[in-house]
């Protein structure tokens, strides 16, 4: 069954990779009120994919890592240049392995490059299963957990696109597997070093991966709180290994940007991004968090496509009517709430994973206090523990194993996937040509 879920993820992600436009200009389905012209878009495909592919292309052409310059006249093309290097090095190598045109300009080139992330997506499915088993969940619960990253439309779309997100999800999930194993069974040298390597590689994938070190810190604290000998030094060793792996890149950033995470250059470059303060002034603080951030992050957890402008339904529930999103979210929330009641509060591994997930949510809220970026993919570094929580909840509801849990999660995941088959290709097609004038 696990192999079936992995194969299903690969097949569905390939479909997203095939139907999503690559490096393609188009039009938003809206009119600029000032110019009375339809809004043009530099890219209509996957979020930031144009810029990620530019990073890979420049790396292949020059053999050097790019530098983010806030005054770059082509900043729109290059605003991902501050990102850590691991994904782009792997993508450049993958490009050569698959004999992709170095220009990376055609849809076929994009499809080849996207397939690398499909592999990473499959690894995330496997790691979610392993995480559930590491916290002593049953085989059936572990398979339920793996269903979520395997079939969740938004995760499938990310696996079928070019970015550093799927590699980040895979590395953080596998690091959490090691953390759960160490906290539950004891930290041997191999587990500690493996966790450290995974944390370091995650930090070399995306700056937000710094949160994985919080999981290691919580694991170290758990060893003292629960007074378990042999479970204290392992996380500290892992932290040391991870920091040693990431340190060269951070030192390089100190020389280039003046800070290890290139935050100064990032802040200067993203000044034109929609500011939270402006949105709050426009609609009010409560409405901002509930109707904008809350609504958009809830819907995009299931799936919103293109540049957050292609919904699974015609309105995305913005008209207040019951939509496919509400059904899916209801099933997932019921599972999560039931999971909170099932998980033992004295389980060290559960507490560590819960604190890590809370850290991801806090960082997300902090980010949206400055920028309006209500995209649930920023929560996906915690997708594996969230999936385990939901699966544990539905397993407790269906304790007699009558199939209710499988049925509920199948509805929550396959119903929106069916809507994606219907609406996503049409949504991209609409944006390829300008709207006809009346």
Ranges and model annotations:
Residues 143-144, 344-366:
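Transmembrane alpha-helix segments characteristic
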Residues 181, 212-243, 250:
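Perimembrane helix-loop-helix junctions
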Residues 101-107, 128-151, 169-170:
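Transmembrane-helix signature of polytopic, membrane-embedded enzymes
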Residues 191-207, 213, 241-244:
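Membrane-interface alpha helices of multi-pass inner-membrane proteins
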Residues 1-36, 125, 224-225, 233-241, ...:
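Start-transfer (signal-anchor) and selected internal transmembrane alpha helices
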Residues 135-136, 175-194, 202, 224:
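Membrane-interface transmembrane helices that cradle and orient dolichyl/undecaprenyl
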Residues 302-350, 407:
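Hydrophobic, aromatic-rich transmembrane alpha-helices
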